[in-house]
């Protein structure tokens, strides 16, 4: 399998927030993965704004949460679903994990890196 490359515009954003590629990303079997803190820094740097998350599914007893997050960057608007359950997270804080996943996906869409890089 061919190793995927990090898009140049994402490399530039990583550098703009004072991080190196090695600090901001890791390689998962040839697929670049970016850390959550790097995406948060990038979002803040370029001025991405988030609306209040919309909780779609909430079953605390089973540890399952799904929410929709919408973000804007100027006139660009993107949304994504974040989910957390015992099947995909060992953490005991499903609301925070669901929000983190949704925000990361929205940031990747807004910066044009969705499908090229994945979030942790």
Predicted segments, located by residue:
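Polyanion-binding surfaces on beta-sheet-dominated domains and ring/shell assemblies
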Residues: 1-120
């Amino acid at each position: 399998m061919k190793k995927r490359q990090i898009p140049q515009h994402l490399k530039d954003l990583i550098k703009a927030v004072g991080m190196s590629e090695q600090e901001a990303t890791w390689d998962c079997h040839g697929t670049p993965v970016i850390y959550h803190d790097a995406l948060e820094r990038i979002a803040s740097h370029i001025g991405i704004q988030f609306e209040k998350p919309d909780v779609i599914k909430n079953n605390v007893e089973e540890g399952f949460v799904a929410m929709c997050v919408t973000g804007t960057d100027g006139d660009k608007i993107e949304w994504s679903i974040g989910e957390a359950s015992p099947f995909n997270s060992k953490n005991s804080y499903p609301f925070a994990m669901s929000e983190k996943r949704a925000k990361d996906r929205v940031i990747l869409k807004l910066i044009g890196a969705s499908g090229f890089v994945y979030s942790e």
